[in-house]
Amino acid sequence: MHAHLDCLSGVVLGCAKQHGVPVRIAHAHTTNQLRDFKYPIKDLYKRIIPRTATDLLACGEDAGRWMFGSAPFLVLPIAIDTEKFRFDKNMREDMRRTLGITKEELLIGHVGQFRKEKNQAFLLDVLHSLRACGTKSKLLFVGDGEKRAAVQNRAAALGLTPYVLFLGVREDVPALLHAMDVFCMPSLYEGMPLAVLEAQAAGLPCLVSNGVPKDCLQTPRARQLPLSAPPSKWAEVILAESKVLSAAPPVLQSFDICENARMLTAYYLQKDVQRRRETAHGSADRIYADV
């Protein structure tokens, strides 16, 4: 059994253990949880994972340490189809034309669900700073969620509604990434955000918060800024990064979906062989005990 339930994996794997499931894998995908009224219960569940799982996997070092503490774990990088996101100039021009973005406008992009930890409202302050200094710029949000209305209201309060595009959930994310000039993620915390990896695969400069793990930064054009830095500083870095031309296509081999599939298949086969050997040894021990 391979559980991707974060803190709740311990509960599910505990039931699997009681029913004799021999291989029980817990997979960590986050580096934190909101400190709401449910957090003490989640923290309790998290602590039982090393006792109910036979194997521990994580999307990154930070996620593994947060979820499993000092218990040993294996990092299995998150997988993306890198070819799907390879930069296409024609696709960029077509999408910018469709979105109504001129050549002179700077387009900042973000892909993600509208949740508290995603902190999208911070990007509105960044856009406000950019426009206040005379930069023709717009902000593009791809995704939906419970906090979307609040972010839209904040945009209206700042007088930014004409300059912010809320596209909702889309199937053409690669084309939308190509249309962007800079990708931003100001999250309070993350595990290994797929959107940041996809943006890097598309060749975009990426600016992320210190809530995003450093091992997510895989190209020279990806960098971190603390959330304690003012929006004006983020605006300054975004403007500087948007003017730097990419010298070569990015290489994200360790995150390539084919490589990831090979790694996971090899891991499953290894565990199956290990289980068969343990079962065989157990049978032999019982035979010798009966003699």
Walk through the language-model features, giving the residues of each.
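Aromatic "clamp/platform" in nucleotide-sugar-dependent glycosyltransferases that forms part
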Residues: 169, 188
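A charged, aromatic-enriched C-terminal amphipathic alpha-helix characteristic of glycosyltransferases
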Residues: 84, 243-288
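Donor nucleotide-sugar binding/catalytic pocket of nucleotide-sugar-dependent glycosyltransferases
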Residues: 51-91, 224
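A conserved mid-protein helix/loop that constitutes part of the nucleotide-sugar donor-binding site
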Residues: 106, 110-131, 135, 146-152
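Short hydrophobic beta-strand element within catalytic cores of glycosyltransferases
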Residues: 196, 205-209, 214
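Short His-centered aromatic/hydrophobic patch
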Residues: 3-9, 28
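Nucleotide-activated donor-binding/catalytic signature segment of Leloir-type glycosyltransferases, i.e.
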Residues: 152-168
